[in-house]
Amino acid sequence: MVDTDDGASVGGLKGVYKWTVDALFGSGVSPSAKYRGLNHGSSRQRYSQDDTNYSRYKPLSSMRSRSRSNSWSVPVPQDPSFYKRYDLLPPISSDDEDYSEEDKLQYGANSNRGSPMVKGLMNPAPVVPKQQNNGYGEFDRRSTNPLFTDPTDTFARRKTSSSLMNNYRSSTEGIGDTAFIEETRNININGRDPLIAKLFGRITSPKKMANLPGKFPSPAKATLDSNRRRKNSVLHSIGSGRVRETSTSLDDKKILSEYMDIISDLDRNNENLSALSEQVEDRNQRYEEIDTEYKKKYYDMRNELIKELKQSKKTHDNYYLLYNKYKELKEMASESNRLKSTIYNLESEILEQGVSKNREIQNLNEKILKLESRCQELEAEKLLERDKYELRIASLEAKLREQNISNGKNYFSDYSYSHRSREFSPDNYRYLNNYFSEEMSDFDADIPYKNGR
């Protein structure tokens, strides 16, 4: 039921009215109840923060990191040695695969809080449930013991919703709003770790620095039952306009024992941290040795690579020199082949010319032989003709002598003539000339081969 200005109940229009009020003002409180207690300073302070609180209730997609300015607000160098020197977590870039879009919107792209490493620290560790026999030979995995069923969420109070924190703060300030008290009454912290429940069971004003890791507030001074009784007493005293605060303190020895338990836990944690630090130092030293060995191998390999590159360059240069020589030899070989072909052609031409010359020489030799044989024949014919001429001359001389003898004249009485001698007497030359001219004319007519020459 929602009260209006005249105090009448709305009845069936409760859902519509509540929806309208939530849509307009972002709050489940009606305007009459909101502005009824303006004379109270605490109420005025609370309602003046509604707009701010409403802006904090925006969806996760529109949220950004809301934190006060600190040393991380200034730019931090990106040198990895800076984070290693101060034992800081390096910022996770926005292109990290494990960096979800929800973490980017909530914590920002350059925040370490949304990194996978820090998220693993803030999330509770899962606990394997204890298997119990249900009496039917089967094991029931749903154990009723919260130590086995609930995770040990150390930072559960840090991740409590903003509305729950406002309810805590309102109840401690003594605001007489029934809705807030009814909401705070249903708060259940039984599922937490017992030690954490003792530490954070008291309803206190949420302080940002008190919830950071490493900050330990005072132990709880009231149990859950006392808190419930206190809430009931506050609810009972709302009608009278005052809030009666009740508190029950624990025994000092119990508080001291709790402090000692916490200190012993811190000692164990410090020992574990020391062992972990030694392991990390050993691992870092081993990594440095490995890094040094890798650097040495790298420089050795680098020097070897430089030598190989120099040798490769030398081989490359020698290869190109050899290739140029090969090209020259190839050109010379092609030139020699051309010259060989030219020589072969010339030899063939010479051979052909030699054959033709031999044929010509043979023909000339044949002609020479023919001419020689012809000369010999002519020589023989000349000898025959000479013999014939000599015989004719001898016969003519004999005939002349016979005629002279018959005529009684002896012209050759004082002169002896030989056909091998060409000497004649001048006195007888005219007579012989006339005589021989007549005789030779008759003789030429008798020679048969003269006309055939």
Swiss-Prot record:
Biased segments, Low complexity type: 61-73
Subcellular location: Cytoplasm, Cytoskeleton, Microtubule organizing center, Spindle pole body
Region (Disordered): 34-76, 93-116, 135-161
Keyword Coiled coil in annotation: yes
Cellular-component GO terms for this entry: cytoplasm; spindle pole body
Alphabetically ordered keywords of this record: Coiled coil, Cytoplasm, Cytoskeleton
Superkingdom of origin organism: Eukaryota
Chain's role: Component of the spindle pole body (SPB) required for insertion of the nascent SPB into the nuclear envelope and for the proper execution of spindle pole body (SPB) duplication. Connects the central plaque of the SPB with the half-bridge. Required for proper localization of CDC5 at the SPB and for proper M-phase progression.
Oligomer status and interactors: Homodimer.
Stated family: Belongs to the BBP1 family.
Name by which UniProt lists this protein: Spindle pole component BBP1
